[in-house]
C-alpha cells in the first residue's frame, strides 16, 4: 500500500501557521499527518532593549521568558486540539537576537547602551526596511539543516512567501527556497490584508497561485485562542475572514485530489509582479 503524504508547515513564529494556514491544516489534520515546526520560539530577559520593553508592555507581560513559555504552551494546546504535531526548533526570535561577531567598539558601546548588542537594535524600523542582516547568514543554514531532518520522501513542505517582508519570515523563506523540491509557499496573513498584497514575486519563477476557502470559520476560532497575541494583531477584535492563498509550481497539484475546495486562480488573477515587498527578498 503506498505511503500517504505527510504535511509539514514551517512557521516562523508561534502564531504564523495558524494565521496563514489554519483553514487548510485544520481540514487536513483529521485525514493525514500534519506537523507544524515553528522556528523562532525563544527569548531572553537580559540584555534588553527599548523595543523589547515596548513589546512586553503591549503584550501585558514584564518577563520575556515567561511570555514565550506561555506562547509555546498555548501553541501546543491549540495544535493538540486539532490533532497537529508540534515541533519547536528553539531559535531566538528576531527581536531578541544578539550579535555573535561584535567588534571591540560594539562590545564597548554595548556596556553603555544595550541596544548595541542586538542584531536589530531598532527593531520596528528595521522590520519596515525588510533587510536581513549579514549576522543572520549562518542562522539561515542552521534552519535549513533542522528542516532537512524533518523532511521525508513523502513530505509536502509549506513555508511563508514573506508577504510584508518581516525579517524572520524572509529568513525562513531563504532557508527553504531552492533547497527543497516542490515547496508550497503561503501568503502571510494578516500582512497580506494590511498591505493589500495577495500576490508575490513567484509568478516569474513558474509558480501558480491557489485559493483555499474551507474551514475559515474554524481558523478564526483558532486565532482567537492565541490569547498572548490576538489583541496585538487585531486590537478592535475584528479578524478578517479572507481566503488563504498558496503558491505552487505550475503543473504541480499541491494536494491529493481528496482535498476539496482548493482551486487554481485564472491567469489574469494570478500575479502582480511589481510587489515591492517581495522583490526585496
Q: What positions do the PLM features span?
A:
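Short N-terminal targeting/anchoring amphipathic segment
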Residues: 151-163
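A structural signal for well-ordered alpha-helical segments within the folded catalytic domains
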Residues: 19, 69-73, 145, 167-170, ...
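Active-site rim elements
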Residues: 61-65, 162-163, 206-210
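Divalent metal-coordination and catalytic microenvironments
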Residues: 13-15, 75, 157, 168, ...
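Active-site rim/loop-helix segments in enzyme catalytic domains that contact anionic ligands
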Residues: 1-131, 148-151, 181, 266
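Generic beta-sheet signal
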Residues: 37-39, 186-189
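Short catalytic/ligand-binding loop motif for oxyanion handling, primarily in non-cytosolic enzymes
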Residues: 17-19, 43-47, 94-103, 165-169, ...
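C-terminal accessory domains and tails appended to enzymatic cores
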Residues: 2-4, 29, 81-83, 100-150, ...
Amino acid at each position: 500500500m503506498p505511503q500517504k503524504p505527510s504535511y509539514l508547515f514551517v512557521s516562523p513564529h508561534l502564531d504564523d501557521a495558524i494565521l496563514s494556514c489554519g483553514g487548510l491544516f485544520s481540514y487536513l489534520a483529521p485525514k493525514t499527518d500534519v506537523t507544524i515546526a515553528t522556528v523562532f520560539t525563544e527569548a531572553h530577559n537580559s540584555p534588553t532593549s527599548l523595543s523589547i520593553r515596548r513589546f512586553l508592555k503591549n503584550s501585558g507581560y514584564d518577563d520575556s521568558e515567561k511570555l514565550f513559555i506561555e506562547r509555546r504552551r498555548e501553541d501546543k494546546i491549540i495544535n493538540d486540539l486539532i490533532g497537529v504535531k508540534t515541533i519547536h526548533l528553539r531559535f531566538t526570535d528576531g527581536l531578541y537576537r544578539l550579535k555573535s561577531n561584535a567588534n571591540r567598539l560594539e562590545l564597548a558601546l554595548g556596556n553603555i547602551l544595550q541596544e548595541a548588542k542586538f542584531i536589530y537594535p531598532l527593531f520596528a524600523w528595521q522590520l519596515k526596511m525588510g533587510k536581513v542582516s549579514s549576522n543572520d547568514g549562518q542562522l539561515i543554514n542552521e534552519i535549513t539543516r533542522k528542516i532537512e531532518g524533518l523532511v521525508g520522501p513523502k513530505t509536502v513542505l509549506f513555508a511563508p512567501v514573506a508577504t510584508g517582508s518581516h525579517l524572520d519570515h524572509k529568513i525562513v523563506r531563504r532557508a527553504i527556497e531552492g533547497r527543497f523540491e516542490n515547496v508550497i509557499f503561503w501568503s502571510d496573513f494578516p500582512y497580506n490584508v494590511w498591505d493589500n498584497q495577495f500576490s508575490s514575486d513567484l509568478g516569474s519563477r513558474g509558480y501558480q497561485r491557489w485559493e483555499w476557502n474551507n474551514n475559515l470559520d474554524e481558523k478564526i476560532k483558532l486565532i482567537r485562542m492565541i490569547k498572548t497575541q490576538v489583541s496585538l494583531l487585531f486590537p478592535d477584535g475584528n479578524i478578517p475572514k479572507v481566503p488563504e492563498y498558496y503558491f505552487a509550481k505550475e503543473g504541480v497539484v499541491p494536494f491529493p485530489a481528496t482535498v476539496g475546495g482548493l482551486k487554481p486562480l485564472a491567469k489574469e488573477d494570478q500575479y502582480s509582479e511589481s510587489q515591492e515587498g517581495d522583490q526585496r527578498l
